[in-house]
């Protein structure tokens, strides 16, 4: 290139190094311990199956058991049995106006039915509304019931004002009474106010609930033992997978070749594990981790290093998807381009063996779309152009990366058929809602840092200019957009649905990762020390004490 390296002014971001070094490459497989745990879990599974069968005739008892299994993180062993139970119970059309069903029970049943796609009406909460249309004052002493109502309200859809009111009432009251509640309820309330169950990462929530359940006087020691064993067994599997992707990442050696990019392979695996933690998704987790890691480098190349002449060429090279394009590329990005094409060659070979090579095609096309949108953003930055909010959002829904990551989350899922990829390519309502959440929450968390780096074409800036709004008003509007998008996701997860529940759950879980990663308006991916490090240690380093 005519321009020398010295003359190039690059938008360097100076990202912090990895927190983990080679920690996960030095992995003790723990094969003997895993085998021992496996046998114990299989024995305990039989006993739990008996418990599920025994609770057949008692609605309240059975629903409490299902909730406990789900919160302890062991319900995936009994998905078929739980779905059968819930289908049966929902068909009973229980009269929840009966005084024998208290607020805790009604809220719990509502949440469980909604979580599993059943269209139970929010009108069942009407009996707790007074003549002025407010929730009754007497509920303020019912901490357990209010917590159950609070968690249920996060399953609301658009137009359910009774649940909007329920969330406001329960949140305010729980904040007020939390210091006066006894443990473990107080701990559960404090945690829920920070991290609502429906928005949380299932493994993190299971880890937290196991410690809370252990304090419960009414706990079932048998279930507690099962949950701990299973948690540690899954952790062993996840550590093996993390070892594999960490070794792959180290062998690529892109950290030394592209020192400007974020070194976040462990955090990328954390994201993939949040999308699916169950054993049968092992290959899918590894494939998704690799695609997220590579996307992170592309993002940083456009956002934090490349100049427009280089990015023009790189965008064309991705569009043409041909190894011969390497000769045209800037030297620094050649190793990455080669590694990216080779990764997808491996994917295609593996998927072709099971007749699913089309999955790689859809992923590549989605990546091309992402890169085109990154290129648009880069040109805005270079030109100092601040687009109208509508124009910004159209492009930014793609650069949030979730279009691409939802597609690549299905690469290793054998049950995902071509129709699923075609559905995602059409940008259905469920996916768009997910993209909105990812975009606006990311924009809130990264606004100040991007502003410091001279990024003018941000969503917050665009919205403020278009609407003559303050930063506080813009942030409030973005949270409102996210809240409405969550309502749309909840609606789209309800039955009947023509779409695969397996695919819907991938989108839902991707949004949960956003809620966790950007908790407290922090960018936990770029700066993982505060937000993600404690979770990663709990999930992949320290086993639960038996």
Swiss-Prot record:
Entry EC no(s): 4.2.3.199
Chain positions recorded as Mg(2+) 2 binding sites: 299, 303
Entries under Pfam families matching the protein: Terpene_synth, Terpene_synth_C
Protein name, per record: (-)-5-epieremophilene synthase STPS3
Catalyses which reaction(s): (2E,6E)-farnesyl diphosphate = (-)-5-epi-eremophilene + diphosphate
GO molecular function, a single term: magnesium ion binding
UniProt: Mg(2+) 1 binding residues: 299, 303
InterPro entries: Isoprenoid_synthase_dom_sf (IPR008949), Terpene_cyclase-like_1_C (IPR034741), Terpene_cyclase_plant_C1 (IPR044814), Terpene_synth_N (IPR001906), Terpene_synth_N_sf (IPR036965), Terpene_synthase-like (IPR050148), Terpene_synthase_metal-bd (IPR005630), Terpenoid_cyclase/PrenylTrfase (IPR008930)
Induction: Induced by abscisic acid (ABA).
Organism annotation: Salvia miltiorrhiza (Chinese sage)
Gene encoding the protein: STPS3
Entry-linked Gene3D superfamilies: Farnesyl Diphosphate Synthase, Terpene synthase, N-terminal domain
Domain of life the protein comes from: Eukaryota
Residues annotated as signal peptide: none
Gene Ontology biological process: diterpenoid biosynthetic process; sesquiterpenoid biosynthetic process
SUPFAM superfamilies for this protein: Terpenoid cyclases/Protein prenyltransferases (SSF48239), Terpenoid synthases (SSF48576)
Key words of the record: Lyase, Magnesium, Metal-binding
Tissue specificity comment: Highly expressed in flowers and at lower levels in leaves.
Binding site for Mg(2+) 3: 442, 446, 450
Function: Sesquiterpene synthase that catalyzes the conversion of farnesyl diphosphate to (-)-5-epi-eremophilene.
Family classification: Belongs to the terpene synthase family. Tpsa subfamily.
């Amino acid at each position: 290139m005519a321009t020398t390296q010295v003359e190039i002014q690059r938008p360097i971001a100076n990202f912090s190094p990895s927190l983990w070094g080679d920690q996960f490459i030095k992995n003790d497989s723990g094969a003997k311990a895993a085998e021992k745990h496996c046998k114990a879990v299989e024995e305990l599974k039989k006993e739990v199956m008996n418990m599920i069968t025994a609770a057949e005739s008692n609605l309240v008892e059975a629903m409490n058991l299902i909730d406990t299994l789900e919160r302890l993180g062991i319900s995936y062993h009994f998905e078929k049995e739980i779905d059968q139970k819930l289908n049966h119970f929902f068909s009973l059309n229980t009269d929840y106006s009966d005084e024998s069903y208290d607020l805790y029970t009604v809220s719990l049943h509502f949440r469980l039915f909604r979580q599993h796609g059943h269209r139970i009406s929010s009108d069942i909460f009407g009996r707790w509304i007074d003549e002025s249309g407010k929730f009754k004052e007497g509920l303020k002493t019912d901490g357990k019931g209010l917590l159950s109502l609070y968690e249920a309200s996060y399953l609301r859809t658009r137009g359910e004002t009774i649940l909007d009111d329920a969330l406001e009432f329960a949140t305010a009251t729980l904040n007020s009474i939390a210091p006066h509640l006894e443990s473990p309820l107080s701990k559960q309330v404090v945690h829920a106010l920070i991290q609502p169950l429906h928005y949380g990462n299932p493994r993190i929530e299971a880890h937290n609930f196991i410690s809370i359940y252990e304090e419960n006087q009414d706990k079932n020691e048998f279930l507690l033992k099962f949950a701990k064993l299973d948690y540690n067994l899954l952790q062993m599997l996840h550590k093996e997978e993390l070892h594999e992707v960490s070794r792959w990442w180290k062998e690529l050696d892109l950290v030394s070749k592209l020192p400007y990019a974020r070194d976040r392979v462990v955090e990328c695996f954390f994201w993939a594990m949040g999308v699916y933690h169950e054993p049968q998704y092992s290959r899918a987790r590894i494939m998704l981790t690799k695609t997220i890691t590579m996307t992170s480098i592309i993002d940083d190349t456009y956002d934090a290093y490349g100049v427009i002449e280089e990015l023009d060429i790189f965008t064309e090279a991705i569009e043409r998807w041909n190894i011969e394009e390497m000769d045209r590329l800037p030297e620094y990005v050649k190793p990455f381009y080669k590694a990216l094409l080779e990764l997808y060659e491996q994917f295609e070979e593996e998927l072709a063996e099971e007749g699913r090579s089309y999955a790689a095609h859809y992923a590549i096309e989605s990546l091309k779309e992402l890169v085109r949108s990154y290129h648009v953003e880069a040109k805005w930055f270079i030109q100092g152009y601040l687009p109208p909010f509508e124009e910004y959002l159209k492009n930014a829904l793609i650069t949030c990366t979730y279009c691409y990551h939802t597609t690549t989350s299905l690469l290793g899922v054998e049950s995902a058929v071509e129709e699923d990829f075609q559905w995602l390519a059409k940008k259905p309502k469920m996916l768009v809602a997910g993209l909105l959440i990812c975009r606006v929450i990311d924009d809130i968390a990264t606004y100040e840092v991007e502003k410091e780096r001279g990024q003018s074409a941000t969503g917050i800036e665009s919205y403020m200019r278009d609407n003559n709004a303050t930063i506080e008003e813009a942030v409030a509007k973005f949270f409102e957009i996210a809240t409405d998008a969550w309502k749309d996701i909840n609606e789209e997860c309800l039955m009947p649905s023509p779409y695969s529940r397996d695919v819907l759950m991938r989108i839902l879980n991707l949004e949960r990762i956003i809620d966790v990663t950007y908790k407290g308006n922090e960018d936990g991916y770029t700066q993982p020390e505060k937000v993600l490090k404690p979770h990663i240690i709990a999930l992949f380093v320290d086993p639960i004490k038996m």
